[in-house]
């Protein structure tokens, strides 16, 4: 099961994703509006999908269109904490490093990491426009 900020997502979970940025793993973009500077994590939970259906879903997931799945198959949530509990150890990939665990917590720590970005970087283009920077 997965619980984010008190909201539970039960049933068989196919994929649980905690994103603090738009891209990972060579171009996957599951949550296109995720930002590292907003003090929150964007969560994506995919439930009850067979391996074959997941293969069909992979393209949509990789280009930020996972939310187009019908009903409660795909849940999006923006928040500060995600806890995942499993009966058996499951594979968890954290920034490219793999570990196995039955329980894992992802928690946003606002201001916990400082970044330096080039002025006008596309990632912050909308923010730069609001402040008048180029």
Predicted regions, residues:
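Long C-terminal subdomains/extensions of small-metabolite kinases
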Residues: 1-134
